[in-house]
Amino acid sequence: MPGDMQETMMFKVEKEEKVRVRDVLTEVQAALTEKGYDPINQLIGYLLSGDPAYITSHKGARNLIRRVERDEILAELLKSYLA
């Protein structure tokens, strides 16, 4: 037992892979459409309020969209629109 205290243990935190906003929006749109929601209206509700309840949990869409900050989504949409 005393020998166990002499060794340094390593702890690794896995980095969360960077997700592309475009990929997130595409997957969320598909999930919302499959459940019969209007993806534009639901995404607007989410972006304005920050309430993830606007996004269905179908296919993990709600968890997926929470991996991206709302300002990142808006920036990507503006870049795409203004380009």
From Swiss-Prot:
Pfam family, one: IreB
InterPro entries: IreB
Matches recorded under PANTHER family: UPF0297 PROTEIN YRZL
Family: Belongs to the UPF0297 family.
UniProt-listed HAMAP family: UPF0297
Name listed for the protein in its UniProt record: UPF0297 protein Moth_1643
Organism the protein comes from: Moorella thermoacetica (strain ATCC 39073 / JCM 9320)
